[in-house]
Each structure stands twice: as C-alpha cells, then as structure tokens.
Amino acid sequence: MMVSLFSQFDSPWLLNIPLVLLALIMPWKLFVSFGPSWAGTRSSRLVYVTMETLMSQVMQPLNKLGFRWVVLFSSLMLMLMTLNVIGLFPYTFTPTTQLSMNLGLAVPLWFGTVVYGFRNHPVIALAHLCPEGAPNLLVPVLVVVETLSILMRPLALGLRLTANLTAGHLLMHLISSAVLGLMELSVMLSGITLLLLVFLTMLEIAVALIQGYVFAILVTLYLDENL
C-alpha cells in the first residue's frame, strides 16, 4: 500500500526509458515566440498584471542594488508556480516534490547571496553572526547558533516546498481512493467525498501558487541581508 501510494512521486518511465530525457532534448519548447498577436491578448495582459503585482511585493524589501536580480526572481517564481500547478493534473509528474530538485535550487541561490555579502560587505556580513548588545559571555555561543541558523536556511527552504506539496498530493490521493471505495457502499457518501476532493483541489492550487511565491520572497529576504 505504501509503495503504491508514494509511487506517484517517482520519475515517469515508458518502455524502460526515463521520460525526463524527452524533456531534456526539447529545450526549444521553453522559449516563447512573442509577436503582435500574443501581445494584444487578454491572457497576456492578465499574466503581465499578475506578475507585476507579485514582483512588486517580492522586490519590496530590496533597495536599488537588488533590482538587478528581478529577472532571476521573477523567472524562479514563475517556474515554481508553473511546475506546482501542472503537477496537480492527472498523469503528470511534479518535480518540485523531489528534495533533490528543491535543494538544487535553494543551495546555489542561498550560497550566491552569502558570497555576495561577504565579497561586498564583509564587516556587515560578519556582524550578522552576533546580535547587537549581546553579553560578552554569550558571544561565542551566539556566533555558533547564528552560523548554524544561516547554514540551515537552504535545507529549510527546500524541505518547506517539498513537504507542503508532498502532503497535499498524498491527501488528494487518499481522498480520491476513498471516493472510489465509497461508490460501492453509498452514492451519497461518495458524492460528499467527491465534493470535499474538489475543494481540496482548489486549496492545493492556491498552495501551489503560494509556495512558489514564498520560495522567491524568502530568497529575496536572504539577499536583502547581504546588500
């Protein structure tokens, strides 16, 4: 039971061939051909307004020096939101439920902010390891605690995204199995459970969008400490 339950998080294979290879050999699908017809559509306007609103909130903590990162953060947030939502469709694979991918995004971004801080403002970066006004006897302990706290940031960033999406997928899988099982016992109970599944799906769509936003804004806050 547990094997079949968690098998939905395995990378899909077809005829003993990993389908991820198919994605890797089709990079041109990632590029969009912008033209006059695309620029004037309502959907493009909706995407533009939505991204403008979200990025204004994400970049709000940063000063002018941080605006050079706006393309990276907007691309990161849009990619995570897209992958999270697409993973809710049937017969799809959600790569953001894999801790390896999330850590692969979190560690380089976090490490880049740390290196940027130590390279441009080494004194300020070191000052973050010891809170202002701390007693002299507690300084060594506080330095160790703050160092561990900073080192745990990418792990917490990746685990947060993985845990939230994995829990939602498992809950949807369990409730959908309950819907099929209750059809033989009571149509009414099955219908009520199906209604619950619909509301849960709507909630998971919101969670998928929010988690992409949270990931991007946390990286922004890490960068703000090192600017």
From Swiss-Prot:
Keywords: ATP synthesis, CF(0), Hydrogen ion transport, Ion transport, Membrane, Mitochondrion, Mitochondrion inner membrane, Transmembrane, Transmembrane helix, Transport. One of its GO terms (cellular component) is mitochondrial inner membrane. The chain crosses the membrane at residues 14-34, 69-89, 98-118, 137-157, 169-189, 205-223. It is a multi-pass membrane protein. The keyword Transport applies. The keyword Hydrolase does not apply. It is found in: Mitochondrion inner membrane. InterPro entries: ATP_synth_F0_asu, ATP_synth_F0_asu_AS, ATP_synth_F0_asu_bact/mt, F0_ATP_A_sf. F-type ATPases have 2 components, CF(1) - the catalytic core - and CF(0) - the membrane proton channel. CF(1) has five subunits: alpha(3), beta(3), gamma(1), delta(1), epsilon(1). CF(0) has three main subunits: a, b and c. Belongs to the ATPase A chain family. This is ATP synthase subunit a. It comes from Branchiostoma lanceolatum. The gene is ATP6.
